[in-house]
Design a protein with these regions (language model features):
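N-terminal pre-domain segments of enzymes
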Residues: 1-26
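Hydrophobic residues on conserved beta-strands that form the core of alpha/beta folds
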Residues: 11-12, 37, 87-88
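Accessory beta-strand-rich segments of carbohydrate-active enzymes
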Residues: 17-21, 26, 48-51, 55-56, ...
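Short, low-complexity, polar/charged sequence segments that are solvent-exposed and flexible
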Residues: 34-37, 61-62, 122-124, 166-167
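Short Gly/aromatic-enriched secondary-structure transition segments
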Residues: 26-38, 43
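Surface-exposed, low-complexity/disordered Ser/Thr/Gly/Pro/Asn-rich loops and linkers
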Residues: 52-78
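Ser/Thr- (and often Asn-) enriched beta-sheet segments in non-cytosolic proteins
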Residues: 10, 42-44, 90-92
């Protein structure tokens, strides 16, 4: 969701979404404002790919989630079984947001997230158990804005995660 000095704009809901079996297949320029995502699927956010029909859900209460997918080789995850998901959504900021600092708050993204706003890269976060917060003030404008997210199933930080939950 968005948060700024007590004002919030929730971005939960249906997002445009494209899932890729490998990171090599992903669209290189999906974050651009002129990119045509009309053929994309949609997905609820917050939500999990695996619980929405993408990839394979894995439940682990002992050991690592990637067991059987790739060998331990910290900090490098295997590229051959590393899914990618790309998300897009527009939102509108009216005059009441003018002059305010605007932050994007992502409660969780497994296992990492890269963020673009209006075609410009904002930042990257790599820890699915912690929230990510990005100052997007200089990237937003009055009126319609585009936010784009890219998430990989595995990343270097994946080696630090081993808990009892669905992945």
């Amino acid at each position: 969701h968005f948060e700024t000095d007590g004002n919030k704009l929730m971005l939960n809901g249906v997002w445009d979404f494209r899932w890729y079996e490998t990171i090599a297949e992903k669209a290189a320029d999906f974050y651009r404002t002129d990119f045509d995502a009309s053929g994309w699927d949609t997905i609820p956010v917050p939500g999990m790919w695996e619980m929405n029909g993408y990839g394979d859900p894995v439940y682990v209460n002992v050991g690592y989630a990637w067991k059987g997918h790739f060998e331990n080789n910290p900090p490098y995850p295997a590229d051959w079984h590393n899914y990618a998901g790309q998300y897009r959504r527009t939102f509108v900021l009216d005059d009441s947001w003018k002059g305010k600092d605007v932050f994007l708050h992502i409660g969780s993204a497994t296992s990492n997230v890269r963020v673009w706003v209006n075609g410009k890269e904002v930042g990257y976060s790599e820890d699915s158990k912690l929230e990510a917060r990005f100052d997007i003030t200089r990237f937003v404008k009055n009126g319609e804005n585009l936010i784009a997210l890219e998430i990989f199933r595995w990343c270097a930080g994946t080696y630090l995660e081993d808990q009892d939950f669905w992945r």
